[in-house]
Every structure is written in C-alpha cells, then in structure tokens.
Amino acid sequence: MTIGNTKQTSAAAPKPTYFDHNFKLEATKVLPGEYVATNRDMLLVTVLGSCVSCCLRDSAANVSGLNHFMLPDALMDSEAAATMPARYGMHAMEILINEMIKLGADRQRMEAKIFGGGNVLKGILKSNIGERNVDFVRQYLAKEGIPVMAEDVLDSYPRKLYFFSRSGRVLVKKIKEVHNRTIFERELSYRERLRRMPLDGSIELF
C-alpha cells in the first residue's frame, strides 16, 4: 500500500493503519489532499464535504485506490486561473493511477466510482466548489475512457465513505447532523494550502 500527498511529487510513504472492529478489516483514513493505492484486502475511509473522491479498481489485478481532493480556487492572475485548477486536478488523478500501475494495475481495466462535491461551504464561499470538483472528475474519466460504475455526488451534506478495496464495494453515510466543525475546518485549511501552492512547474503529470 502506498500513500502520498497530491501537492507533492516525492515518492509515496507507508500509511498508518488500524483495525476496524465493525467490518473486521485493516483500515486507513484518507485525509484531504491524500491518496492511497493498495493491493491488500482493506478498508479505505474518508469524510467528504465539497471535496471529491474517486475510487478506482482493477479487479483482475486486485489493485484499488482512492484519492481525496478539490480544485484550487482561481484566486490568482487570469492566466494562472485558466490553467491551474485543471493541472492540479489532473495531477490528483494521475498520481493515483500511476501508483496503482506500480502495484500491477492496468489503466485499461480500471473502473471508477465517484463521491462527494457537496455544497457544504455555502455561506462561506461564493462559488459552489463542490459542483466544480464533480464536473472535473466526470470530464477527466470520460476523456480517459474509464467507466463510472456508480456515483453519489452534489447535494448539501458531508459524506463518510467506506471503500472495500478487494470487492470494490462502497458504503456511503450522509452526515445530516454535524456536531462539530472538523470537516469544514479541514476543508478550509486544505483550500488555503492550495491557494499558496507554487505555480513553478512543481506539479508533475505522468
């Protein structure tokens, strides 16, 4: 199993895991800006607000992966605003696919499921960044010829996602009552990190 941060081009590092007693599986949490690729039978867990996750799987190779990202805001000069969001989104997808290929997956056999993009930051942000994230993932997968087998996107609620890597099964729980601001604070912090991301070519596309 490998993990990385989609802002970096460095090699992926081992990801801490825990045992999920409910599902009786090894599990790991995927935070905003991270991705995980694995050939082990395990549970990938993430909580999504306006961010999106793409669950990818090559069932023949028993290799799966999940990312958790949003597109940067276009709060920059007009030239950068026209190119940076797409460049970052492509990187978030390509780095996951590349790590899966290293584990034996074949890009031509991959299938996708997409989740998230809820309008959970309404009242904080003027634009619906969740809708923009979903549009990007759909367009990217269509262009790459990766079929989307299922999706649960948009709406106004955060989601907790459980991706069973070996079977490809996904359980989604919509969080209609939020008891603390952890989800929102993580996303706003991630958004600020993206706004400060350098535009000097440090994003590597495979």
Curated annotation (Swiss-Prot):
Transmembrane segments: none annotated. Its EC number is 3.5.1.44. It is an enzyme of class 3 (hydrolase). It comes from the Bacteria. Signal peptide: none annotated. Keywords: Chemotaxis, Hydrolase. InterPro entries: CheD-like_sf, Chemorcpt_Glu_NH3ase_CheD, Cytotoxic_necrot_fac-like_cat. GO terms for biological process: chemotaxis. SUPFAM superfamilies: CNF1/YfiH-like putative cysteine hydrolases (SSF64438). It holds the Pfam family CheD. PANTHER family: CHEMORECEPTOR GLUTAMINE DEAMIDASE CHED-RELATED. This is Probable chemoreceptor glutamine deamidase CheD. It comes from Laribacter hongkongensis (strain HLHK9).
